[in-house]
Amino acid sequence: MSKARVYADVNVLRPKEYWDYEALTVQWGEQDDYEVVRKVGRGKYSEVFEGINVNNNEKCIIKILKPVKKKKIKREIKILQNLCGGPNIVKLLDIVRDQHSKTPSLIFEYVNNTDFKVLYPTLTDYDIRYYIYELLKALDYCHSQGIMHRDVKPHNVMIDHELRKLRLIDWGLAEFYHPGKEYNVRVASRYFKGPELLVDLQDYDYSLDMWSLGCMFAGMIFRKEPFFYGHDNHDQLVKIAKVLGTDGLNVYLNKYRIELDPQLEALVGRHSRKPWLKFMNADNQHLVSPEAIDFLDKLLRYDHQERLTALEAMTHPYFQQVRAAENSRTRA
């Protein structure tokens, strides 16, 4: 059995009410308090709008959920309620539903986001350090509260660059961590799926989020989005193996006694490890430093137990400047 290196017993030690989302009784607010202004996005499970609270004229985000199991909606609500007020976690303000269709909507705080495809290419070396550090605060917080996000990717990280404000959003795939529990491997978005998901290791943990963060970070520093560009789940593992090498993959599979299905094994083939510096070029060299490479190398590990935890990541030399700036601000 594989078990998280940190925060493994959070839900064991908390009362059942904390993690038993199926028992949640939803307190519905008043739908007429909110009006849709414009559509800002759509996902597999929802449509997202900029809205307005007509009582105080404040902007908000309205996430109208597509028909999905009641249990899944309750899970998302319970997790958002448990995490509310945590650093850089999007705030759930209200839950409403349509009187006739019974379609539920989640009302969130408004964040003025710049699309990452536009924003990321403009970010400086320091900006990347700053925003990854802000994202780590959100991840360490949710992990410390016994919750894995399971869908970390640029689309789910809202950045208001003018205010230098970051929010981790879309908790629809998030789940409570219970040691030894076997989870669905059909989570996360393909380019950000950890090796554990791609080889069907089900007793994964918070460290899945650290792989996804590593993919996101690699994309940012090497200006290569997405960093691992697989065409399907099998090809995704192939793309990872072509960078990390197949020797490490085999060590990982043997350690956890995992057998790849023969078709996937044939596809993966044999590859040597590609040094990180091979991804450096004239366009990205100003973002690639020895500390950045060292940090990346400690995230993108096949073995989920070897990856840095979010808290360990925050102490990495890569963030030294960010920590120093934060300390001088708190002292000021």
Curated annotation (Swiss-Prot):
One of its GO terms (molecular function) is protein serine kinase activity. The active site is at D151 (proton acceptor). Keywords: ATP-binding, Kinase, Nucleotide-binding, Serine/threonine-protein kinase, Transferase. The keyword Kinase applies. SUPFAM superfamilies: Protein kinase-like (PK-like) (SSF56112). One of its GO terms (cellular component) is cytosol. The keyword Ribosomal protein does not apply. It catalyses: L-seryl-[protein] + ATP = O-phospho-L-seryl-[protein] + ADP + H(+); L-threonyl-[protein] + ATP = O-phospho-L-threonyl-[protein] + ADP + H(+). InterPro entries: CK2_alpha, Kinase-like_dom_sf, Prot_kinase_dom, Protein_kinase_ATP_BS, Ser/Thr_kinase_AS. Its EC number is 2.7.11.1. ATP binds at V40, G41, R42, G43, K44, Y45, S46, E47, V48, K63. It holds the Pfam family Pkinase. It is an enzyme of class 2 (transferase). Residues 34-319 form the Protein kinase domain. GO terms for biological process: DNA damage response; regulation of cell cycle. Belongs to the protein kinase superfamily. Ser/Thr protein kinase family. CK2 subfamily. Casein kinases are operationally defined by their preferential utilization of acidic proteins such as caseins as substrates. The alpha chain contains the catalytic site. Tetramer of two alpha and two beta chains (possible). This is Casein kinase II subunit alpha. It comes from Zea mays. The lineage of its organism: Eukaryota, Viridiplantae, Streptophyta, Embryophyta, Tracheophyta.
